[in-house]
């Protein structure tokens, strides 16, 4: 089975594209996911991943690359959510729920207008084995930009993630870094859509990060471990999907979930918690 997968990598260009794309998305998704779970923004990640659907649908209708429409609508959704929840009367989860459900409904209607149920299935659940050269290179370039941004602004992102009040008192522009993270999240959601689809993007973002959180004692270690786990889950999931002829995107997510489940019971932090409970 492994030899067949290796032979496929050597002989099939589409599988080479899929492997490279899966690795890149696993790495960048794991890195960004650390900031998402530390800020308690998992629901925001889910919202943006669904909100890109209208942009993808419009891109199909206009015959342009789906990255363009998806990024525009992802940024629009994140801006709307941030603006609505700035009202003290409206809670954060309410703003997110209203926005992402509205964008999702609009996207489904637009896909219906385009008369493309096959494309809708691929958008919702991903089709990494169909990644073209152009899509792969866009994914690589966008991911490099995201990783470079995290590296350059690591310290202020760290401060605003752990203690935004302290960061503000130190003169850090908290709102700027919030919007910066929203842009980063949107870019990653759009690139990950090819791998697992809009439905499962949030799992690819938060599961490796949550697993790394069980082991790491610093943000740098957490990011490195999360990226490694994301890459590992992506490769194993692709191998399982290709070998058994099942959805590779879903296989990637389930592999990542299995790694989390194992870590949940054996990680040092969990062992310490169990000892504390016994005492």
PLM-predicted stretches and their roles:
Residues 4-13, 27-38, 55-65, 158-166, ...:
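Short juxtamembrane and helix-loop transition motifs at transmembrane-helix boundaries
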Residues 23, 27-31, 72-80, 106, ...:
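Generic alpha-helical transmembrane segments of integral inner-membrane proteins
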Residues 18, 66-74, 93-97, 135, ...:
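Loop-to-transmembrane alpha-helix initiation sites
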Residues 199-250:
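Transmembrane alpha-helical segments in multi-pass inner-membrane proteins
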Residues 246-279:
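Cytosolic-side transmembrane-helix boundaries in multi-pass membrane proteins
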Residues 25, 136-208:
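Helix-loop-helix "hairpin" substructures at the membrane interface of multi-pass membrane proteins
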Residues 34-116, 213-224, 241-244, 267-268:
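Short loop segments and helix-boundary regions at transmembrane helix junctions
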Residues 2-17, 88, 96-155, 277:
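Transmembrane helix-bundle core of multi-pass membrane transporters
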